[in-house]
Curated annotation (Swiss-Prot):
Signal peptide from the UniProt entry: 1-15
Location(s) in or outside the cell: Cell outer membrane; Bacterial flagellum basal body
Name of this protein: Flagellar L-ring protein
Residue stretches spanning the membrane: none
HAMAP family recorded: FlgH (MF_00415)
Topological type in the membrane: Lipid-anchor
Residue positions bearing lipid (N-palmitoyl cysteine): C16
A GO BP entry: bacterial-type flagellum-dependent cell motility
Coiled coil stretches, renumbered: none
Originating species: Shewanella oneidensis (strain ATCC 700550 / JCM 31522 / CIP 106686 / LMG 19005 / NCIMB 14063 / MR-1)
Keyword Chloroplast applies: no
GO CC term (a single one): cell outer membrane
Function: Assembles around the rod to form the L-ring and probably protects the motor/basal body from shearing forces during rotation.
Source lineage: Bacteria, Pseudomonadati, Pseudomonadota, Gammaproteobacteria, Alteromonadales
Amino acid sequence: MARYLLLAAALLLTACSSTPKKPIADDPFYAPVYPEAPPTKIAATGSIYQDSQAASLYSDIRAHKVGDIITIVLKEATQAKKSAGNQIKKGSDMTLDPVYAGGSNLSLGGIPLDLRYKDSMNTKRESDADQSNSLDGSISANIMQVLNNGNLVVRGEKWISINNGDEFIRVTGIVRSQDIKPDNTIDSTRMANARIQYSGTGTFAEAQKVGWLSQFFMSDWWPF
């Protein structure tokens, strides 16, 4: 009975330890930053044109300060392939010829004293893994911080509700202001310390998850 209780406890612990934290919309970590603009004092000059509200037709529209919006073009592609194998062979062979004494075989209970023993073992294991992923699209993010060297910390998320579930994209990383294109976009491959997450919640996402019993058989707790 104790063995069954221990096995049940191990199954429960495995299931609990492998349950990831569910993502939520409006996560404070991805909340946008709203810069505080100082109040603008407009002098009453009687003219329609105001210097404080003027903008150049040739000014740079690229994001460069906290709160600005930048569009990140997702161009991610990864491919990994790995194969491994090992083979172990072991064998032993031992022979003991009959023992003679006084011109006759020594015996025990009428059975001659001789020995022949042979043993062999052959273990072979092979494993192959081939995985490829790609992600294309775009997402707009906010500049959260401007570092001392001019690099920009960007972060943002996008949630899309479809039927009975939600799909989301989250992006965070560090970009150089020099890598931002004139149309205020930057490729995701130009981001440092990039964290790109594309997943979903709801019925469709839950259907793709592995059950807790299957997780146990595929975990390190399974002894075979």
